Regions:
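Accessory alpha/beta interaction modules
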Residues: 1-172
Length: 173
């Protein structure tokens, strides 16, 4: 990891800087997320690959949790000096790991309290919801991104299928 990347990550760990970037780019400058509502989250996510059952490590640049009105959501700022043409898939990996981490925590809580869903195959009770995971990609290059911004940009669809699928878009800054 280069010195520039470390400096960027260090700056973004300041909650006031993080909240300013989120507010300007996600909420049009409105002060929706305050520094006081943010808490740091570990950037390392461990996930098990379905294909070979091996553990994998994912490293998010600067993740934080925002607690607002007794509800939480996760925000992650990803630094990109070089344009990455698979960024939507990388982001899906981060989000998948973060959602699976939440499911694991809820299931563990259910096990401890005996609050099992019925039927057990549901895994979570109907009233149990996950917290959203939102990633903003900060483009530090001198040029426009010009790479895929959503999964659909990376896919080659048979005729008439593309418009049927939901776009999973990156929030690119």
């Amino acid at each position: 990891m280069g010195a520039k990347d470390l400096a960027e990550k260090n700056l973004l760990q300041y909650k006031d800087v993080f909240s300013d970037i989120v507010n300007v780019n996600l909420f049009g400058g409105r002060c929706y997320v305050s520094a006081e509502e943010l808490s740091r989250e570990p950037g390392e996510l461990i996930t098990k690959a379905v294909s070979d059952d091996k553990l994998r490590q994912l490293q998010m640049d600067v993740p934080m949790k925002c607690k607002k009105h007794n509800r939480s959501f996760f925000l992650c700022l990803e630094n990109q000096s070089d344009k990455n043409n698979v960024m939507p898939v990388r982001d899906m990996g981060y989000q998948h790991a973060k959602y699976m981490e939440q499911i694991k925590e809820v299931k563990e809580s259910n096990r401890k309290t005996g609050n099992y869903p019925n039927p057990m195959t549901k895994e979570l009770n109907d009233s149990q919801k996950l917290s959203p995971v939102i990633t903003l990609v900060l483009n530090y290059s001198q040029n426009e991104w010009g790479k895929p911004r959503c999964l659909n940009d990376m896919l080659e669809f048979p005729e008439d299928i593309g418009e049927k699928l939901t776009k999973l878009s990156l929030i690119h800054i």
